Amino acid sequence: MSRPITIVTGQWGDIPLEKLAPMMSGFGYDGLELGGGHFDITRGAKDRKYCDRIRALLDKHHLKVWAISGHVVGQQVCDPNDSRSDAFAPPELAGKPQEKRVWAVATMKDAARAARNLGVEIVTGFVGSSIWHLLYSWPPVPEQTIEEGFQYFARMWNPIFDVFDECGVKFALEVHPTEIAFDAITTKRAMEAVGNRKAFGINFDPSHLVWQMLDPAQFIREFPDRIYHVHLKDVAVRLTGRNSILGSHLPFGAAERAWDFRSPGHGDVDFEEIIRALNHIHYQGPLSVEWEDSGMEREFGAKEAIEFVRKLNFSPSSIAFDENF
């Protein structure tokens, strides 16, 4: 089992793909998870020649692509769409929540078409949530209100998943706070809300689970047939008795934050247990480094990360160790 090691390009959006591809190839990555400004979803849905040019550029540098990212677009499908998401939509839609939503739905349908044209079977991303702000049950939140949130997710996303089915592409939700699914319980409920359809699965990222005090390896084993894609990102939890796990309204990188993302191997994620769990479910897709660390130089981190992941990327045993005495 030789899983490819890729890197998410969204955090490198300031570097053109023509420069980023040879850089990441030089670091030793096998491919790119295209996001940010490195792949135009709408253009890719309509222009096969554009997709061919992207492929040719990657081929030139011995890179492949197994997934494209639709995170910032997908978020706007179910999000309240306040001013925070204005930067993620066309400028003329700023301050127009419903118009952003309509655009996001159309663009996520295009994401499936663009993936097909690029020869990719997975779109990773977010779905948003109309009920995330109701996480803390005060004032009291009726169960019916929560159920309506899951049904709203189903109404908004089932037509999108219909297009994914038509294109032979799957959507992998990054289970994450601010999404309809942020732990195992809400993931199961979200899947049930859309009829457990195969178009909807998981982009597994342990960093978002660990700071919520979840067990990432257990999560993998609970959804063995729905782990469609994997992000490798670390997180460090540093509760001091003064700060809250909720973040204290402090930005990433602030010294007093209770938790922060780290380059793989520099936080609290038990990556060996994750690899063992992935081996257990026979996952053979990419291990995609999503590099985020406010305390480390970016290129140093990306180079170190692939070496760390390469050492972890072991196959399961093909024999029982106690059969050969």
Please place each PLM-identified region on the residue numbering:
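Glycine-rich, proline-tolerant flexible connector loops at the mouths of alpha/beta enzymes
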Residues: G35-R55, V127-L134
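Short, well-ordered coil/turn segments that N-cap beta-strands
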Residues: M1-I5, G28-D30, D59-W66, L118-I122, ...
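Active-site acidic/histidine proton-transfer and metal-coordination neighborhood
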Residues: D14, E18-K19, M23, D59-K60, ...
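Short amphipathic alpha-helices and their capping/turn segments at secondary-structure boundaries
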Residues: E18-S25, A45-W66, T107-E121, D215-Y228, ...
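Active-site beta-loop-alpha junctions enriched in small/polar residues
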Residues: V8-W12, G35-G37, G70-V73, G128-S130, ...
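Acidic/histidine-rich catalytic cores of soluble enzymes
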Residues: K19, G31-L32, I68, I146-D268, ...
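Boundary/entry segment of secreted carbohydrate-active catalytic domains
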Residues: M1-I15
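C-terminal helical cap(s) of enzyme catalytic domains, especially alpha/beta-barrels
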Residues: R298-S318
